[in-house]
Design a protein with these regions (language model features):
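Active-site beta-loop-alpha junctions of metal-dependent nucleic acid enzymes
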Residues: 3-30
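Extracytoplasmic/secreted cell-surface and envelope-processing proteins
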Residues: 13, 47-50
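Short helix-terminating capping/connector loops at secondary-structure junctions
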Residues: 30-35, 60
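RNase H-like two-metal-ion nuclease catalytic core shared by retroviral integrases
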Residues: 41-43, 50, 54-56, 65-89, ...
Length: 161
């Protein structure tokens, strides 16, 4: 899972971030639609420009964006598991005001490093890099965290400057 920090939480800002990602992926010969043929999101205003997410810069459809119903975690259980793991590190009620992209990347690198029953004892990072590559994980800002170094508690935040 990859999360981007949005300063203003607007559709324009989200569209800009997704276009920057698509451009960056292309510069490494990766196609966004091959990596993410389906996008699941909530109904937040920052996701209201579906065309920016679904189409490439030429207007060609490359992925499909689906909006999940409010209060329906069963529609995106894997995302909800990541949310639970995130909350192990950043408890509900915590402020995100000082969260830089680097801080979020480190938090989700730890989330992605947790071994999971659903992956037969592998981590999301292990599964992702098996199918795609460590290069792509690095392009996305996802770092490998050795199992013995995973910190799945608020203590991780104290290690981040």
């Amino acid at each position: 899972m990859r999360i981007w920090v949005l300063e203003n939480k607007t559709a324009a800002e989200a569209a800009e971030k997704i276009m920057l990602l698509k451009t960056r992926l292309k510069s490494f010969n990766f196609n966004f639609g091959d990596i993410a043929p389906i996008l699941l999101t909530d109904n937040g205003g920052e996701f209201s420009n579906a065309t920016a997410f679904e189409n490439d810069e030429s207007g060609n459809l490359e992925t499909h964006l689906f909006y999940c119903e409010p209060n329906s975690p069963y529609e995106k259980p894997d995302i909800e598991k990541n949310h639970t793991l995130f909350r192990d590190i950043v408890p509900k009620g915590s402020s995100f005001d000082d969260f830089s992209q680097e801080k979020v990347d480190l938090i989700f690198s730890h989330v992605n490093a947790v071994k999971r029953k659903q992956f037969n004892g592998k981590s999301a990072y292990d599964v992702f890099t098996f199918y795609y590559s460590e290069i792509l994980a690095n392009v996305l800002g996802i770092s490998f965290i050795p199992p013995e170094n995973v910190i799945q508690s608020p203590r991780l935040l104290k290690t981040i400057k």
